[in-house]
């Protein structure tokens, strides 16, 4: 039995459905992420798990017990917010100890647990400091410690890294992974940042307009998206209109509108005549000078429309003969690289037969 079972949960606000008949199972010890754009329902769902809001229908079961109607303070759940929510008039130690004091724990136990958590979050000598004396990353660590001090069954994290700068956010991701491994408590993490979800999670639920589009491991979410929304939301894709010409267990043969035929990975349920798009990620696309004609079967000529230099790689936007645009990444440390391609340069783009994915759902 899963630790957390969300069964057909719906939440409406007037005529607007924020969460629409959602069902999710979360296993004990799992780092599970709710990922989606603003307004997709992820925070509303988190609030219902915490008890700050109630579903209009459905069940939320924790260890098999229905949580609907149980107030937040009575649930074995704690929430860490993006704003830290630290008490400014309390020291770090008192902030961490607050949930234990409210629970009536003995002073000796409180001191022991607080010191243990300060060690775990790498702030052993910060107990007597006040929040205004801490950096953003230190405040976030204190918030994590306070969330863990009463040993909840679930720790809910509502975009906790959103207020941090990029470098600190990356450092905190590593700390969060290590902390979850050490403690073994189930984390449910809410974010709109795809890179965070991919880096942190055991599994991800991608949400859109109140629905769950796909639940899977990060690698499968990225490489085998279930539909166009998931493919487009997770990372970058280029799409080309395509029709299935051949569908066999080993591969699909697709006719790309206005260009020619390519080979793509097989997908269950596809039939000859199905129309959709071939979605391909920039890192799967090779770009070369036309004189170095690709040995790959999937290749077309094009012209550089634009490019974006971002330090370690350059992203090239190539216009194909049918007017479609496809992005390609080229490492700036590529062996033998003499110069960048320039706008209007003629190029060849190519990709392996096992790259890309055919999607035939509406965008």
UniProtKB/Swiss-Prot annotation:
Q: Please name the SMART domains in this protein's record.
A: AAA
Signal peptide per UniProt: none
Catalysed transformations (reactions): ATP + H2O + polyamine-[polyamine-binding protein]Side 1 = ADP + phosphate + polyamineSide 2 + [polyamine-binding protein]Side 1
Q: How does it sit in the membrane?
A: Peripheral membrane protein
* GO MF annotation terms: ABC-type polyamine transporter activity; ATP binding; ATP hydrolysis activity
Q: What does the UniProt keyword field contain?
A: ATP-binding, Cell inner membrane, Cell membrane, Membrane, Nucleotide-binding, Translocase, Transport
Compartment(s) of residence? Cell inner membrane
Question: What domain of life is recorded for the organism?
Answer: Bacteria
Residue ranges of every copy of the ABC transporter domain listed in the record = 4-234
E.C. no: 7.6.2.11
Q: How does it assemble?
A: The complex is composed of two ATP-binding proteins (PotA), two transmembrane proteins (PotB and PotC) and a solute-binding protein (PotD).
Q: Which family does it belong to?
A: Belongs to the ABC transporter superfamily. Spermidine/putrescine importer (TC 3.A.1.11.1) family.
User: What PANTHER family does the annotation carry?
Assistant: SPERMIDINE/PUTRESCINE IMPORT ATP-BINDING PROTEIN POTA, SPERMIDINE_PUTRESCINE IMPORT ATP-BINDING PROTEIN POTA
Any idea what this protein is called? Answer: Spermidine/putrescine import ATP-binding protein PotA
């Amino acid at each position: 039995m899963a630790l957390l079972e969300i069964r057909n949960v719906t939440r409406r606000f007037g005529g607007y459905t924020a969460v629409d008949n959602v069902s999710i199972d979360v296993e004990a010890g799992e780092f599970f992420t709710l990922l989606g754009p603003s307004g997709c329902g992820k925070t509303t769902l988190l609030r219902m798990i915490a008890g700050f809001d109630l579903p209009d229908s459905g069940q939320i079961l924790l260890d098999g017990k229905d949580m609907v109607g149980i107030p937040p303070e009575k649930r074995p759940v704690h929430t860490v917010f993006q704003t830290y929510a630290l008490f400014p008039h309390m020291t770090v130690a008192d902030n961490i100890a607050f949930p234990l004091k409210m629970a009536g724990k003995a002073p000796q136990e409180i001191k022991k647990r607080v010191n243990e958590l300060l060690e775990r979050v790498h702030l052993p000598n910060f107990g007597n400091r006040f929040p205004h004396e801490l950096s953003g990353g230190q405040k976030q660590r204190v918030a994590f410690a306070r969330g863990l001090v009463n040993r909840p069954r679930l720790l809910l994290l509502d975009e906790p890294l959103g207020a941090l700068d990029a470098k600190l956010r990356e450092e905190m991701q590593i700390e969060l992974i290590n902390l979850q491994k050490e403690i073994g408590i189930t984390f449910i993490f809410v974010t709109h940042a795809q890179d965070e979800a991919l880096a942190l999670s055991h599994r991800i639920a991608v949400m859109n307009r109140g629905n769950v589009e796909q639940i899977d491991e990060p690698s499968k979410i990225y490489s085998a998206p279930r539909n166009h929304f998931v493919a487009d939301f997770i990372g970058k894709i280029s799409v080309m209109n395509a029709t299935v010409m051949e569908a066999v267990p080993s591969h699909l043969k697709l006719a790309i509108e206005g260009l020619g035929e390519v080979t793509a990975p097989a997908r269950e349920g596809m039939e000859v005549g199905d129309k959709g798009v071939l979605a391909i990620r920039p890192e799967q696309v090779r770009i070369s000078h036309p004189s170095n004609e690709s040995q790959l079967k999937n290749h077309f000529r094009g012209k550089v429309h634009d490019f974006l230099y971002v330090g370690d790689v350059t992203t090239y936007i190539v216009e194909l003969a049918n007017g479609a645009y496809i992005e390609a990444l080229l490492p700036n440390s590529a062996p033998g690289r003499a110069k960048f391609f320039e706008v209007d340069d003629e190029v060849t783009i190519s990709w392996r037969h096992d790259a890309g994915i055919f999607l035939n759902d509406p965008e």
